[in-house]
């Protein structure tokens, strides 16, 4: 590229402009004359989900397995609204696999980022704050929708792990724990050899450990194992907890490095999870954690601009504004403190000003490539599309405008736009209820 620029600058400029125009043309969307049929959209989303689903091992795809929290959350909402035996069974399978195998740390709690195999056995050992927040919320919701009280334990363990291991300074929570241990071995902080287990536990304790967890030696690294949950074994709870704590004490000697950045968006997701847990468990500890984190979120907002990261430069993105606003609003509903709902409203209004116009959504205030239009709708990624959250939190007029602009993209690929598809469905359902009430 450097040689091209230096040898023929005019041609390079023309070539760049042509690329920009092609990208712009591919993103250009006209507002739909009418919103799509919500029933057909839901059917298409579920069909697409099952076309990608692994119905033997749970999850989506046949190689790496990511939690895909946004899609699972929408599918749970659809299951709650209109129960389906097939969808129920798939959701239970997926959530059981995620909680019981290699994606989840069976000793300390918390989830790894993803697994590198389709059977949920070998994780990429990084632990991300956004995963902990979303999966705690997901399992709390799934416990009610699927009538699985044990999922509440998964949610609680996940949040307790965050409280113990991911607290940062000044009230926020850090971004991640490294996949590598201090010696540079991936998973070294979590894997066990037979020799290490035997030297850590007595014979009786080792029997308890092997009854509680499966140790598939050699499936991770030669001679090493990551413990999986073992079903159907009855172990004395006090003895089981003593063994777990003893293993954790040994593991504390191999603590993974921490990425201490405190990101507004991810902390906003966590604030919502704490607020939900404070209600679900009627727990003062989660309420105190939510209150402290809400105050930290307030400190990131100066009335016109939100800071992206505590103590570091950088413009906040649409995701930062919306996830923080959603977390503050969730805690305001629980705590009844007006300062949090007021700040949430300010963030929501500012996000629409900064990141949306007639051409669509922008993730940041500044485009990486000047001249490109915004996106009519944003796909879900590891986190829900912030544009869909903006629609959920916006005014009726804003929702209508944004939904019409993104309708074509969403209806063409609803699984990848699941959060947007849910907003379309909710909007149309609300309109039907309103029309029905008016007719009466």
Spell out what each predicted region is.
Residues 164-167, 299-322, 329-440:
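Long, polar/charge-rich, low-hydrophobicity segments
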Residues 1-273, 277-280, 404-440:
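Replace the tail clause
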Residues 97-104, 292-300:
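Glycine-rich, acidic and aromatic/proline-enriched surface loops and short helix-turn segments
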Residues 114-115, 278-281, 285-286, 302-312:
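Glycine-rich cofactor-pocket loops
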Residues 82, 148, 276-288, 333-342:
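Acidic, serine/threonine/proline-rich low-complexity intrinsically disordered regions
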Residues 135, 273, 324-327, 390:
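Active-site-proximal alpha-helical segments within enzyme catalytic domains
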């Amino acid at each position: 590229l450097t040689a091209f620029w230096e040898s023929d600058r005019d041609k390079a400029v023309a070539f760049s402009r042509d690329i920009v125009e092609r990208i712009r043309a591919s993103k250009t969307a006209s507002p739909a004359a009418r919103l799509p049929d919500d029933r057909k959209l839901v059917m298409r989303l579920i069909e697409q989900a099952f076309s990608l689903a692994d119905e033997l091992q749970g999850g989506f795809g046949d190689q790496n397995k990511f939690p895909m929290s946004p899609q699972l959350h929408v599918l749970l909402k659809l299951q709650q609204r209109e129960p389906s035996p097939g969808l129920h069974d798939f959701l239970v399978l997926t959530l059981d696999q995620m909680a019981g195998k290699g994606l989840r740390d069976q000793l300390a709690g918390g989830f790894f980022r993803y697994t590198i195999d389709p059977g949920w056995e070998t994780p990429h050992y990084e632990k991300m704050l956004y995963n902990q927040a979303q999966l705690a919320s997901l399992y709390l919701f799934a416990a009610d929708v699927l009538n699985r009280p044990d999922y509440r334990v998964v949610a609680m363990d996940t949040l307790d792990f965050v409280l113990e291991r991911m607290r940062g300074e000044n009230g926020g929570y850090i971004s991640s724990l490294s996949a590598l241990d201090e010696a540079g071995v991936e998973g070294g902080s979590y894997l066990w050899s037979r020799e290490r287990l035997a030297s850590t536990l007595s014979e009786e304790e080792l029997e308890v450990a092997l009854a509680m967890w499966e140790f598939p030696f050699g499936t991770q690294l030669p001679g090493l194992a990551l413990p999986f949950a073992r079903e159907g074994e009855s172990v004395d709870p006090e003895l089981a907890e003593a063994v777990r704590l003893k293993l954790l004490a040994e593991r504390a000697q191999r603590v993974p490095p921490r990425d201490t950045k405190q990101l507004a968006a991810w902390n906003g997701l966590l604030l919502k999870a704490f607020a939900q847990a404070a209600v679900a468990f009627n727990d003062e500890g989660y309420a105190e954690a939510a209150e402290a984190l809400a105050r930290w979120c307030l400190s990131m907002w100066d009335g016109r601009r939100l800071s992206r990261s505590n103590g570091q430069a950088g413009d906040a993105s649409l995701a930062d504004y919306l996830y923080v606003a959603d977390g503050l609003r969730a805690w305001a509903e629980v705590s009844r403190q007006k300062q949090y709902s007021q700040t949430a409203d300010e963030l929501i209004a500012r996000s629409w000003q900064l990141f949306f116009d007639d051409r669509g959504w922008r993730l940041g205030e500044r485009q990486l490539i000047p001249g490109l239009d915004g996106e009519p709708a944003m796909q879900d990624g590891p986190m829900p599309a912030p544009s869909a959250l903006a629609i959920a939190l916006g005014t009726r007029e804003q929702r209508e405008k944004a939904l019409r602009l993104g309708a074509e993209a969403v209806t063409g690929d609803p699984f990848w736009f699941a959060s947007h598809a849910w907003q379309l469905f909710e909007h149309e359902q609300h309109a039907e209820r309103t029309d029905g009430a008016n007719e009466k």
